[in-house]
A protein has these predicted regions:
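Polar/charged alpha-helical tracts
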Residues: 43-50, 111-114, 168, 191, ...
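Short, gly/Ser/Thr-rich active-site loops of penicillin-recognizing serine hydrolases
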Residues: 117-122, 128, 180-209
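Hydrophobic alpha-helix feature that most strongly marks membrane-spanning transmembrane helices
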Residues: 94-97, 101, 121, 168, ...
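Short loop/turn motifs at secondary-structure junctions and domain boundaries
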Residues: 154-157
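Short glycine-rich loop/turn motifs
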Residues: 134-135, 159-161
Length: 209
């Protein structure tokens, strides 16, 4: 589905999705990221480790990735292929947490954010808590010490990640791990990511960050 969505956006804009994102979001926000790691410098990326300590992707393998030259050629990168730091991903999460704005600039309309947060259907899974599926985002009540959170998870080549934000307070947390064992908690979240996120939410409340 994300492959089709990415390719559709490319057809609509007449350019690679990554080029559109660079111009519309990444460059104005000071974000260094790309769906094509070949656009980044070797020193900007980290080696990716599996849970046994074996390297899954070296820095050179990542930055040696071929960069598509025509729309549609890079569609397979769009489901989970974004290379970005936790700090820069937090900037993108801030857009959602603040109804489309970041540092006084509007990047998405409030209506677009509301559409992304609209529940499409509920999902029940054996062994984990049910969640509401929105557009890309998921939502749960009583999660990580908050009344409700929107969130998105990701995993590839030893990386487990979790971004989340509280629509009531406008804050959020991003955790990206490499080399952690595969573990899913009773809420369906990667265990280490969830534990770190909960501690960070608690710290923000305690110190009013």
């Amino acid at each position: 589905g994300i492959c089709v969505l990415g390719a559709t956006l490319e057809l609509a804009s007449g350019q690679l999705l990554d080029d559109y994102l660079q111009t519309r979001f990444f460059q104005p926000m000071g974000v260094r990221a790309s769906f094509y790691a070949g656009r980044l410098e070797t020193e900007e990326v980290a080696a990716l480790y599996g849970s046994t300590g074996v390297v899954q992707r070296t820095r050179e393998q990542q930055t040696g990735q071929e960069i598509p030259t025509e729309t549609g050629m890079g569609a397979s990168y769009y489901p989970g292929g974004l290379t970005i730091s936790a700090a820069d991903l937090a900037k993108l999460v801030a857009i959602l947490a603040n109804d489309g704005e970041y540092q006084g600039e509007t990047y998405l309309s409030p209506e677009s954010v509301a559409a992304m947060e609209t529940v499409q259907f509920a999902v029940s899974q054996e062994g984990t808590a049910p969640f509401d599926q929105c557009l890309i985002l998921r939502r749960q009540d009583g999660l990580l010490g908050r009344n409700q959170l929107y969130y998105h998870t990701g995993s590839a080549y030893g990386v487990y990640s979790l971004l989340s934000y509280d629509p009531d307070t406008g804050d959020g947390v991003v955790v990206i791990t490499s080399g952690a064992p595969w573990e899913v908690d009773d809420r369906g979240l990667y265990g280490l990511c969830a534990r770190l996120s909960e501690k960070l939410y608690a710290a923000m409340e305690e110190h009013e960050i």
